[in-house]
Every structure is written in C-alpha cells, then in structure tokens.
Amino acid sequence: MAKIMLGSHSVKSHGWKVAREHLCDWLILVVLGLIDIVLNVIEPFHRYIGPDMLTDLTFPFYEDTIPMWAVPIICILVPICIFIVYYYYRRDVYDLHHAILGIGFSCLVTGVTTDSIKDAVGRPRPNFFYRCFPNGKPKFHPDTKDVVCHGVKKIIKEGYKSFPSGHTSWSFAGLTFLAWYLSGKIKVFDRRGHVAKLCLVFLPILISILIGISRVDDYWHHWTDVFAGAIIGIFVASFSYLHFFPYPYDENGWAPHAYFRMLAERSTGRATTMTRTGSRGMLGNDVEPGNSASSPHDRHRESTDSDF
C-alpha cells in the first residue's frame, strides 16, 4: 500500500497545534501521575497474619534484581527513544505525539490501577517474615495473634504490597504498547509470512516476561501476583494503543487515527475552496454579456460529447 504523504508534519511546523488540541489529555496525564504518587504514600491495608500463616512468607529478603527506578526506563524511555527514531525517519509529529501520549496513559493508568489494588488488598510478600522480624524472632499480639512487627517501618509497609506485581504490570503496559506499535510500523500482518517480524514484535513481550519472573526469583512476589500484573498491563496497553492507532492488520495501521482525520479535514477544506472558486467563476460568466467563454459544466459536457 502506498503511503499518503502530503508534506512534512514536523514538531516545528505542527507540534504546538497537535499538543494544544490534546492539552486536556496531557493535564489528565499529570493528574494520574499525582494520584499514583498519593497511592504510594498512603498506608496499605494490613492483612491479618497469624503464626500458622508465616510458612509461605519466610523466604529470604533479597535486593531487587531489577530496581524500581529501572522500570520506567525500560518500559517508557526506551520505547520513546524508538518513537523518536521513527519520527526522524518519517517526520510525522502526529505519530510521535500520539505514541508518547498513548504509552504515558498506558503506564499511568496501569500504575494507578495496580497501586489501588495493592493498597486495598494488602497481601504480604513472600519475604514478609524478615521484613517484619529482621532478627528472625517472631512476635505476636497476645489476644489477636496477629504479627507485631519490629522492623523498619518503610520496609514493613512495602511488605503489604504483594498483589499485584507493579514491576510486571508496568513492564507489560509499556512494552506491550511498544509491541503493538512495532506491529503496525513493520506490517507484521501483511500475510507474507516473515518470521523475523514476529521475532521483533515478541522481543518486548519476552523482556516483560523475564522481568516478571525476576520478581518471583527474588521472593518479592507470589506467581499469582505476577500473573495478575501481566493481565492488567496487557489489557490497559491494548486499549490505550487502539484508542490512538488502528489495528496493525488494518490497511491504515501504520499511522494514528489523528493523522488520517487531519488528511480528511484537509481534503474537505480543499474541496470546499474549489467549489466556491468554481461557483464564483460561473457567476462571473453569467453576468458578463456577450462572453463566449463556456462554464466548467459546459466544457465538461462538450468534452464528453466529443468523445462520441
């Protein structure tokens, strides 16, 4: 399929126009970020943990294989770098803007959803015992038999945030969006059967899976936490991508909806201008007496008659 190219739509020429049209969306993005910060500050629900429940919570307390600060780099900054590279190849600010806005919504909606569930559920992590009792000596309330933690407050707080996995949900939110994006750009569903295209699309998904596995290996999450996080990330990423872009197998799957809407509006504007110009020309010919010039309609009719 030949791509429709009507001049360059660069950041310099159309960037402010596109951003201004979506100013409300960017403000919502900021609000989502603030909400997620609040959700990370508030205290999660402290689920009851009795002596007989510690069996599955006494795994070693290891450091993260992939620290939390690295997750936004992997799932947001790396995809944005790919979006920018594609922008310099095609010079389409519509694609760049909607890709960045889309992955931002994907990750922040996922973050708010994940952290809301974390705070509400309050599931203890597999390494909760050593978060709660750093010296290895458990202590329980004499009446309720609930744990009485004597560890670092911040570490204990994080110990109640096992379900679902934030690393996993964020990774799938960003990298699934990237997989959708690559599918549309390289036309992975062009029915030519090139396996290399599938490998490229599956690579971000594989990275997300490995990040999720690392959370189980580090004893920071149960496998069900990782599974739930993956479902949330994939679900939100898919909806976010399809909100801004067509399906990758669509004929126009290589560009955002806004790009084709802009082309349609431009074509409509040109057609309206040509119609008005033609109408003024026809009126001028009718007013001038003795003008032998024929109208566009007459010329079209004469041209048609001459063909026969």
Swiss-Prot record:
It is found in: Membrane. Residues 296-308 have a biased composition (Basic and acidic residues). CDD domains: PAP2_containing_1_like (cd03390). GO terms for cellular component: membrane. Keywords: Hydrolase, Membrane, Transmembrane, Transmembrane helix. Its main location: membrane. The chain crosses the membrane at residues 26-46, 66-86, 93-113, 162-182, 193-213, 226-246. It is a multi-pass membrane protein. Residues 274-308 are annotated as: Disordered. The keyword Nucleus does not apply. GO terms for molecular function: hydrolase activity. It is an enzyme of class 3 (hydrolase). The keyword Cytoplasm does not apply. GO terms for biological process: phospholipid metabolic process. InterPro entries: P_Acid_Pase_2/haloperoxi_sf, P_Acid_Pase_2/haloperoxidase, PA_PP_rel. Its EC number is 3.1.3.-. It holds the Pfam family PAP2. PANTHER family: LIPID PHOSPHATE PHOSPHATASE, LIPID PHOSPHATE PHOSPHATASE 4-RELATED. Belongs to the PA-phosphatase related phosphoesterase family. This is Probable lipid phosphate phosphatase 4. It comes from Arabidopsis thaliana. The lineage of its organism: Eukaryota, Viridiplantae, Streptophyta, Embryophyta, Tracheophyta.
